[in-house]
């Protein structure tokens, strides 16, 4: 199954296409004034069976595109567990806030802290 993952942030929209849990391709676009338009451009590329969104605009994406949503915390933990199985933490410095996530075994979230800029 091919999955399109979208991180719809306040400054950029990041896309990754996965098959069997492995990355096939990735792209980034500026969010601009309409992050959903940037997300739509990635969706229109096709080549996916399923879409999941995270980030600042995830709920709008669910309304616009009917995709599944996950929190950024869960998305980061899952990604770290797949790409860096020994990772103990994740740091995200985003356009809206900064997050620090402590990971346990298999990418399980042990704790996290977040501050707004």
Predicted regions: what is each one?
Residues 1-73:
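N-terminal glycine/serine-rich phosphate-binding loop of ATP-dependent small-molecule kinases
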Residues 72-117:
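Glycine-rich phosphate-binding loop of actin/hexokinase-like ATP-binding domains
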């Amino acid at each position: 199954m091919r999955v399109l993952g979208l991180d719809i942030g306040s400054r950029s929209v990041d896309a990754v296409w996965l098959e069997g849990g492995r990355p096939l391709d990735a792209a980034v676009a500026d969010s601009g004034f309409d992050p959903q338009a940037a997300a739509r451009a990635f969706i229109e590329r096709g080549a996916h069976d399923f879409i999941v969104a995270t980030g600042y605009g995830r709920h709008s994406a669910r309304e616009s595109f009917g995709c599944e949503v996950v929190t950024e915390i869960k998305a980061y933990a899952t990604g770290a567990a797949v790409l860096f199985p020994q990772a103990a933490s994740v740091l995200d410095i985003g356009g809206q806030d900064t997050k620090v996530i402590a990971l346990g075994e298999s990418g399980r979230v042990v704790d996290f802290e977040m501050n707004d800029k």
